[in-house]
Amino acid sequence: MLITQIIMKQIRDYPIVSTISIAVSTVLASEVIWKLVQCSRSKREKASRVHEVIIFNELGEICAAVHMRNSSMGSQKPQVSPCCNTHCSLRNVAKIVEQIDRAVYSIDLAIYTFTSLFLADSIKRALQRGVIIRIISDGEMVYSKGSQISMLAQLGVPVRVPITTNLMHNKFCIIDGFERVEEIRLLRKLKFMRPCYSIVISGSVNWTALGLGGNWENCIITADDKLTATFQAEFQRMWRAFAKTEGSQIQLK
């Protein structure tokens, strides 16, 4: 009661100072509450982020006939009908497609060979959503039979390759990499950003029918901040190093 009386007396005696003090206190309290909300939200988001190892092996295709019977004509996504095969290749591909379909701002793909129609369709959907896509590939494999890279280049996706006979043998994809998203924010002068978080997809597997459905391969999908930052930094380095090849060395066939 005494404290309340003292506060009221201060307000009467010093109305301007008291008003400013109350306003500042309210703002500070709001900031603290907002930070707590952000912290709580961040913890929930991190807990729900993906960290998964996908294994491809000779057992992945034993259920292929069932999926073919249950698939719809012209579908652009893997039709994963109920399947008891824990090694199902189609389910594994669907997990990669799911992450690409979640891309908000950027996809940076460094891939040796890329012929998968399902994954190419998911990249095209991202392009239609306004996602900025960049591809680094091998100078020879961009022309391999069934390569989807030339097709994506025709749609406006910039493609770069090394100026060397050494192989560009990487197989990784960064989705909404923090550094890249910040670059896009500054480039587009965006004031409000949609929620997103960085994902990296990497492993031994090429994005081909055989790699995704017959070979013994592995693929890691993770939202680990350090890993995504490391892959993003290497992509950025290669992108700058191969700058001369964009639009000049890639001749569409």
Curated annotation (Swiss-Prot):
Topological domain ranges for the Cytoplasmic compartment: 31-253
Domain of life: Eukaryota
Main location: mitochondrion
Localization per record: Mitochondrion outer membrane
Coiled-coil portions: none
Matches recorded under SUPFAM superfamilies: Phospholipase D/nuclease
Disruption phenotype: Defects in mid oogenesis. Females are viable but produce eggs with a range of dorso-ventral patterning defects. Flies lay few eggs, all of which are completely ventralized and often collapsed. Effects are due to defects in piRNA biogenesis and derepression of retrotransposons. Defects are not only present in germ cells but also in somatic cells of the ovary.
GO MF annotations in UniProt: cardiolipin hydrolase activity; identical protein binding; RNA endonuclease activity, producing 5'-phosphomonoesters
Residues in the Mitochondrial intermembrane compartment per record: 1-13
Enzyme active site: 169, 171, 176
Residue stretches spanning the membrane: 14-30
Keyword Transmembrane: yes
Keywords: Differentiation, Hydrolase, Lipid degradation, Lipid metabolism, Meiosis, Membrane, Mitochondrion, Mitochondrion outer membrane, Oogenesis, Transmembrane, Transmembrane helix
GO CC annotation: cytoplasmic side of mitochondrial outer membrane; mitochondrion; P granule
Limits of the PLD phosphodiesterase domain: 164-211
Gene Ontology process terms (BP): dorsal appendage formation; lipid catabolic process; oocyte karyosome formation; oogenesis; piRNA processing; primary piRNA processing; regulatory ncRNA-mediated gene silencing
UniProt function note: Cardiolipin hydrolase present at the mitochondrial outer membrane required for piRNA metabolic process. Acts by catalyzing the hydrolysis of cardiolipin (diphosphatidylglycerol) to form phosphatidate (phosphatidic acid or PA) at the mitochondrial outer membrane surface, promoting the piRNA metabolic process. Plays a key role in primary biogenesis of piRNAs and is required during oogenesis to repress transposable elements and prevent their mobilization.
Subunit structure: Homodimer. Interacts with miga/CG12125.
Family membership: Belongs to the phospholipase D family. MitoPLD/Zucchini subfamily.
Notes concerning its domains: In contrast to other members of the phospholipase D family, contains only one PLD phosphodiesterase domain, suggesting that it has a single half-catalytic and requires homodimerization to form a complete active site.
Name of protein: Mitochondrial cardiolipin hydrolase
Species: Drosophila melanogaster
Source species taxonomy: Eukaryota, Metazoa, Ecdysozoa, Arthropoda, Hexapoda
